[in-house]
Amino acid sequence: MTTFHFIGIKGSGMSALAQVLHDMNYQVQGSDVEKRFFTQKPLEEKGIPIFPFQKENIKEGQQVVVSAAYSDEHEEVVAAKEQGLEIQSYPTFLGEFIQRFTSIAVTGSHGKTSTTGLLSHVLGSHCPTSFLIGDGTGKGAADSHYFVFEACEYRRHFLNYRPDYCIMTNIDFDHPDYFDDINDVFSAFQEMAMQVKKAIVACGDDEQLQGIHANVPVVYYGFNEDNDFQARNIEVTSEGTHFQVFVRNNHYGDFTIPRFGKHNVLNSLAVIALCHYENIPVEVLARELKTFEGVKRRFTEKTLGGQILIDDYAHHPTEISATIEAAKQKYPDRPVVAIFQPHTFSRTKAFLHEFAEALKQADHVYLCDIFGSARENKGSLSIEDLQALIPGAHLLSENDLAPLQDHRSGVLLFMGAGDIQKFQQAYEHVLTT
């Protein structure tokens, strides 16, 4: 029996795909660096072997899947080539694999992971559904009708996919180490749109997405009246957000989600529109939207003492604004404290002023050193450049987190795509010892 060997198995997409194949009774193993990542816990729970990188991992009879983070010079890739094994990159393998199912890609500059998780939750309650989420979560079922997966635009990886459906949440300028500008990002999404086989569900409130052309129907959702699916009469309570949905100006249903912020209403609308297209009963939608518990590292809360600690992946100004808005909606009587670790020097430099404006929406701001990519040149940029643009912002080190204790009833938002979690873990240790 063929064994799938994943080179870089701790990557979020790789981890999720390994879990999908394991659930479908394939033999799966992988290798990676020895540093611990949150993505490896589900691998360990499923008994999927994880080895340190070494060429001896490569053996006859394997099919090799390589993370896009590793080049052809990697010792295991070289060994696989020498043995004549089949080798595919993660996007190439996934692009072929999804053809077995009714495939639904979820893409966009922001909101991909949350929307993929929500759609998987709703569809999975109705019929067998496999899914691959960017938080490292994957589930496979051989009899699946649907395969829901997160499709990343970075380096145009999503052009490896030709899905039946595609949800497009928004188009924003990000990944400045690869994309030239917003027009370059749009061109990637436009190319993706031409590869979709049945229909596209897109946010009509997004100015860029309004310009998308395709050979299949484009169904728009949003708050504006000219959308096919529109959210109206939005009410925020202590339990979450209630709204009504109108389909081409006809009342379709009332929905409640246990989440806060306009972005979560939009994510829900995307799922409602896709499920309506697939004739999923409105009763199923209403029931399942109400019970979705969220995905990893997206507004993940815990209470310690009198403080609320929230872990969030927000690493772009748009995402930071959305996270702060959600915190203020849910906890209107508490001060919101932003603890932010910028991710990559290229992104920090490109959006320095936008980061400052987004963070100013918090009541207090703490900044951690920039988390740099191993592939980039630091240059002269430092965290002090961002601090200078935010009045009252403080610098925070992992060894001195005591200032956070001053905000006794605060909502502490630990935000970033690097290793901001180690700051939260260290702070939790301070509070409990």
UniProtKB/Swiss-Prot annotation:
One of its GO terms (biological process) is peptidoglycan biosynthetic process. Keywords: ATP-binding, Cell cycle, Cell division, Cell shape, Cell wall biogenesis/degradation, Cytoplasm, Ligase, Nucleotide-binding, Peptidoglycan synthesis. Gene3D superfamilies: Mur ligase, C-terminal domain (3.90.190.20), Mur-like, catalytic domain (3.40.1190.10), NAD(P)-binding Rossmann-like Domain (3.40.50.720). GO terms for cellular component: cytoplasm. The keyword ATP-binding applies. GO terms for molecular function: ATP binding; UDP-N-acetylmuramate-L-alanine ligase activity. The keyword Nucleotide-binding applies. Its EC number is 6.3.2.8. It is found in: Cytoplasm. Pathway: Cell wall biogenesis; peptidoglycan biosynthesis. InterPro entries: Mur-like_cat_sf, Mur_ligase_C, Mur_ligase_C_dom_sf, Mur_ligase_cen, Mur_ligase_N, MurCDEF_pg_biosynth, UDP-N-AcMur_Ala_ligase_MurC. ATP binds at G108, S109, H110, G111, K112, T113, S114. Pfam families: Mur_ligase (PF01225), Mur_ligase_C (PF02875), Mur_ligase_M (PF08245). It catalyses: UDP-N-acetyl-alpha-D-muramate + L-alanine + ATP = UDP-N-acetyl-alpha-D-muramoyl-L-alanine + ADP + phosphate + H(+). Belongs to the MurCDEF family. Cell wall formation. This is UDP-N-acetylmuramate--L-alanine ligase. It comes from Halalkalibacterium halodurans (strain ATCC BAA-125 / DSM 18197 / FERM 7344 / JCM 9153 / C-125).
